[in-house]
A protein has these predicted regions:
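A conserved short helix/loop substructure at the end of the activation segment
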Residues: 72-86
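C-terminal regulatory tails of eukaryotic serine/threonine kinases
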Residues: 84-146
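Conserved C-terminal C-lobe helix
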Residues: 61-73
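Short proline-rich PxxP-based motifs
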Residues: 48-59
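Structural helix C-cap motif within protein kinase domains
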Residues: 29-32
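Conserved end of the kinase activation segment
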Residues: 4-14
Length: 146
């Protein structure tokens, strides 16, 4: 959780960039950026010090631009965080140098992973017509409850 959320300060989309940075850190390093025995201890660690990946601890297969990207996302101060000045900061980062943003935005990019379509473990009774039979009045009532 981003420090500004923990401190109950006003926040914006940069808290999501922080979250992506934490996830990317975990993917790269194979561990959490902050380790504590409980939520309070983890919160105190996040608020006490800035974590970063040192260039001398880059795992094999990862680049320095990936480290720079992750370190930019996990900045404690939102104004210093990568993406604080808009999504173009993310899109223009060197780690995405060869990424085709236009193909992504126009849905022309193939997924790098396609899960099997085997529905053997899927209970079909949960998807069959139960929502098709709902009348307009019931649907409106559901919408009002939301």
């Amino acid at each position: 959780m981003a420090p500004e959320v923990m401190c109950k300060q006003n926040h914006g989309v940069s808290v999501d960039y922080y979250a992506v940075g934490v996830i990317a850190y975990e993917c790269m390093m194979g561990r959490r950026p902050y380790n504590g025995k409980g939520r309070r201890e983890i919160r105190d660690l996040i608020l006490a010090r800035q974590i970063k990946i040192d260039y001398n601890e880059i795992p094999q297969g990862w680049s320095t631009s990936a480290v720079d990207f992750i370190n930019g996302l996990i900045k404690r101060k939102p104004a210093q965080r990568l993406g604080a000045n808009g999504p173009s900061e993310i899109k223009l980062h060197p780690w995405f140098r060869d990424f085709d943003w236009d193909a992504l935005e126009s849905y022309k990019m193939d997924s790098p992973f396609k899960p099997p379509t085997d529905d053997e473990n899927f209970d079909k009774k949960n998807s069959e017509s139960e929502w098709k039979d709902i009348n307009e009045e019931s649907l409106q009532h559901c919408i009002e409850l939301l």
